[in-house]
Amino acid sequence: MSRSAGNAYDYVIVGAGSAGCVLANRLSEDPSVRVLLLEAGGRDRSPKVKIPAAFPQQFKTKLDWDFATEPEPHVDGRELYVPRGKMLGGSSSMNAMLYVRGRPLDYDGWEAQGAPGWGYADVLPYFIRSEDNVRGASAYHGAGGPMRVSEQRSPRTLNRRLLDASEAAGIPRIADYNGPEQDGVSMFQVTQKNGRRFSAADAFLRPALTRPNLDLRTRVLVQGVEFDGERAAGVRIARGRRGSEVVPAAREVILSAGAIASPQLLLLSGVGDAEELRAAGVAPRHELPGVGRNLQDHPFVTVIWEITGEDTLYGADRPRHLAEWLLRRSGKLTSTVAEVCAFTRTRGGLPAADIQFHMGAAYFEDHGQEEHDGHCMVIAPVLVSPQARGQVWLRSADPRDKPRLLTNALSERDDVESMLAGMRLAREIAGQAPLRDLITTELRPGDAVKDAPELEADLRRRLMLIYHPVGTARMSDTHELAVVDSQLRVHGLQALRVVDASIMPTIVGGNTNAPTIMIAEKGSDMIREAA
């Protein structure tokens, strides 16, 4: 193992995903500090990254970490697919570009769980700071920030019917689900600029790469954190087939590798549950049993109909649609597949929506890998506040081995009931006058699936995760399984922070990219204030 000469860098950031790109930008704003950003993947130049509707084509390619859970006991023993971006921008270069912040009560809940300074009033300024919203500046939105938030450029005409049918089914129309109220139906806001994906790499990293005090290294496998006593002194990276090199950090090491890789790196570094570490062949360094626990994700299932006579994404792969996108950045290929969003409560007594609907003019099954020859419509209920909790743990002491994951999806009866209610409500929306006459047949679950046992069996057979893993380095000053404190410092260690979706105590009620960017914006201020 070799050691880089001197303390060349003040901050070493692991992971050039959504959080890492923000941190690299904000920390390097100070010209007196040196920042190194390390990324295991490569560049984000692929057309599959830039063309919005092509995001499912990235799945299970070299752009994807391609994680999967262990056999999940409550979904017929299936392994659930968990894609994660392996390139600059991380999953912001792979996701569906849906800009959703979550609910004020989500963040107030974080504060109540031992994270002072993370209530909604505290985090809202960081959402605003990061944003360049085409709607302009307001009490809830920013203009002139790095991240472009747009209206959809070429929405499907079916969206009007989806909005009207949702309203007819009792879901009110809402102007802005990222404002003070979330419940209702509206069009998705998207992280696109002129019909093209606008990732965290586009927004935060590329403008900062001209700075002489920021270095970026891609295709670097980080093997773990190096310590000097209880202080993080740098990171160990792979060099060649068998060698390694230590990259020192004079001030801090910051893990921003995401909710799967950040806990994996802590565990590989000997930080975690000592008994589990020994079982994986890792010598324990610091007992912190919460590392990898508290894994949460949003499960979803699709309800799909074949329809007639509407503008759908069927045939979007034809050359004329590619030509339209290349020449005008418009047309079907600007679609995020899910174009209409609804948040609703499926029963009384809930403090907030338990279901989010992703609606679109497309056939979307098996993560977009399954095809259907015909025009379709999908309404997919997503469980936004799951009670199930899972874990990330090591498969071995080899950093090249993917960690083991288990979400325990559908292990809690309340989760099952909310999902079943969401499937029924999807059918109710489709049965309203604006949509009813378009439908020729229900493809998923299918017209024959009617009674409760059949519907639940279908749910367990087809349930998927919607790519929002969080919670595996829980933030709290007081919780017994907390990994980081409210300043995002790893408990019991020095000069080591986790700044990404791992730190969420509970998953937010909506998509997770915007909250991850917010976490990094707030975390960057904490790091600079501590310097």
Task: Locate the predicted segments by residue.
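N-terminal redox-cofactor-binding region of secreted/periplasmic oxidoreductases
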Residues: M1-A531
